[in-house]
């Protein structure tokens, strides 16, 4: 009886042990091959499963159709390292495809994993930050800011982080872009990307920061870039600056 009880206890502990594995451990355990995982998309994220991923917007009286959808990510793994990331929104996995399906994972876990994947760098095909930006219930702009400011991170990844930071909602994201653009010790290309991202903020939200760059940044190339994007904004504050300069 004691032996039977012991065996039952051992087997009852197995699922808990398997469940204790982190998402990176589950992916690395494959060794080599294709991994599929699925997680909830944040509100407003839509897609057709392949050709289109978009974030819909509306106004006070109209809202574009966008049913809650899931993000599906295929990872190509070789010798326990991810070599390719393919992201989809909507659709479904084709049956019969040779892949290890991890099923549905927590969006917060997925976002953290893809941020760490981007931070690792290396020769990865695809954009690991894209699925992180799509994940539901995840605030990733602090991680994007950290990536953008870390010299050890590959330049291409840092520029991509700034791009996605520019797409993030909220005043905190705009302030982060402002701080990157004004960081005289930062990489010029990353700072120029921050200036561009500021110009893309909705409602001319980035105009005050662009005005500061154009007026007082010590780098003439950044001032020139800020002036260019201010010229595209058609904002009265930008026109006032041009009048001030030309006077």
Name each model-derived stretch.
Residues 122-123, 153-156, 186-189, 204, ...:
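Alpha-helix N-cap/helix-start positions at coil->helix boundaries
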Residues 18-20:
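Boundary at the C-terminal end of the N-terminal hydrophobic targeting segment
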Residues 107-118, 137-149, 170-182, 203-215, ...:
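Amphipathic alpha-helical scaffolding segments comprising HEAT/armadillo-like alpha-solenoid repeats
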Residues 22-117:
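N-terminal accessory interaction module
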Residues 132-136, 165, 169, 198, ...:
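Alpha-solenoid repeat junctions
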Residues 6-15:
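Bacterial N-terminal signal peptides
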Residues 1-4:
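Positively charged n-region of N-terminal signal peptides that target proteins for export
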């Amino acid at each position: 009886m004691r032996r039977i009880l012991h065996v039952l206890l051992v087997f009852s502990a197995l699922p808990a042990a398997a469940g204790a594995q982190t998402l990176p451990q589950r992916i690395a355990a494959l060794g080599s091959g294709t991994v599929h995982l699925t997680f909830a998309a944040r509100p407003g994220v839509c897609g057709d499963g392949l050709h289109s991923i978009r974030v819909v917007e509306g106004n006070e009286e109209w809202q574009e159709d966008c049913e809650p959808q899931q993000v599906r990510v295929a990872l190509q793994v070789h010798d326990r390292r991810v070599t390719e990331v393919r992201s989809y929104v909507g659709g479904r996995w084709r049956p019969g495809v040779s892949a290890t399906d991890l099923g549905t994972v927590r969006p917060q876990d997925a976002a953290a994993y893809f941020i760490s994947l981007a931070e690792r760098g290396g020769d990865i095909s695809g954009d690991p930050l894209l699925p992180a930006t799509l994940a539901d219930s995840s605030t990733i702009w602090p991680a994007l800011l950290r990536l953008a400011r870390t010299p050890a991170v590959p330049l291409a990844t840092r520029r991509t982080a700034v791009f996605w930071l520019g797409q993030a909602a909220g005043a905190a994201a705009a302030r982060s872009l402002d701080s990157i653009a004004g960081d005289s010790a930062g990489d010029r290309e990353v700072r120029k990307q921050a200036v561009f991202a500021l110009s893309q903020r909705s409602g001319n939200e980035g105009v005050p920061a662009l005005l500061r760059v154009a007026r007082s940044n010590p780098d003439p190339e950044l001032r020139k870039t800020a002036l260019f994007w201010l010229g595209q904004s058609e904002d009265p504050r930008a026109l006032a600056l041009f009048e001030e300069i030309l006077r």
